[in-house]
Amino acid sequence: MNTQTTPSPQFYLTAPAACPYLPHEMERKVFTHLVGPRAAEMNDILTQGGFRRSQNIAYRPACESCRACVSVRILAQEFEPTKSMKRVLAANSDVIATEFAAQPSSEQYSLFRRYLDFRHQQGGMSDMTVLDYAIMVEDTHVNTRIIEYRRREEGSGLEERPKGELLAAALTDTMSDGLSMVYSYFNPALERRSLGTFMILDHVRRTKALGLPHVYLGYWVQGSRKMDYKTRFQPQEHLTPRGWERFDPSSMPESTHD
């Protein structure tokens, strides 16, 4: 009897490089390609195991002397917004969110560039071209969508792409157990709207509506101020050597970063 076996994914290790989050640390990553008919299934398994997706690559930290990067996921069905989060929702009551296929636009790239130039001038993405952005959005073999957030105008919702200024966007994977926020960006001039927080709250709402348990936020690095905001969304679980465990935020200082 002939049996067919599905090839196992091949994993690779990057060379050491300077850590973008913690000074004096070096990072390494283990990665594999997400391609073929099992790409979506593998993305589910690997994300639940602490990997992140970037284009058709799934990766996770494999640093020799540091374990600071911790995978975080919100328990969406138990989540209730805090008073400050309710204020964020109220401040963005004029925003309409629309989901599209993972296709880039010049309008998206213009906003993406404004975000990078303001928030990540020295980061590894700072020199991304319009072609780089298009590849980031389109190069996916899993169930990926892009969600646009626009200021609501008269007639919005009656067309395929609503009218109104594009305020923010999120590249999102739908998985068997929830949503994974691959990358999000927003207009940095609209600080009072806390659009970063608003997009996470919207993903929690969407996950609840789907009847799924988790919103994956990527990595949290204790000691990195730019990551502190992720611990505000409770309850949440962190991936430990013992598996996913509920996180106790009582020891963490409250952050106002959005």
Swiss-Prot record:
Q: Which Pfam families match?
A: ATE_C (PF04377), ATE_N (PF04376)
Q: Taxonomically, which superkingdom?
A: Bacteria
Give its localization.
Answer: Cytoplasm
The task this protein performs is described as: Functions in the N-end rule pathway of protein degradation where it conjugates Leu from its aminoacyl-tRNA to the N-termini of proteins containing an N-terminal aspartate or glutamate.
Q: Which GO terms describe its cellular component?
A: cytoplasm
Q: Which GO terms fall under biological process for this protein?
A: ubiquitin-dependent protein catabolic process via the N-end rule pathway
Instruction: Family membership, please give it.
Output: Belongs to the R-transferase family. Bpt subfamily.
Name of the featured protein: Aspartate/glutamate leucyltransferase
The UniProt transmembrane annotation reads none
Q: What is its EC number?
A: 2.3.2.29
Which GO molecular function terms does the record list? arginyl-tRNA--protein transferase activity; leucyl-tRNA--protein transferase activity
Which PANTHER family does this one have?
A: ARGININE-TRNA-PROTEIN TRANSFERASE 1, ARGINYL-TRNA--PROTEIN TRANSFERASE 1
What catalytic activity does the UniProt entry give for this protein?
Answer: N-terminal L-glutamyl-[protein] + L-leucyl-tRNA(Leu) = N-terminal L-leucyl-L-glutamyl-[protein] + tRNA(Leu) + H(+); N-terminal L-aspartyl-[protein] + L-leucyl-tRNA(Leu) = N-terminal L-leucyl-L-aspartyl-[protein] + tRNA(Leu) + H(+)
Q: Which UniProt keywords apply?
A: Acyltransferase, Cytoplasm, Transferase
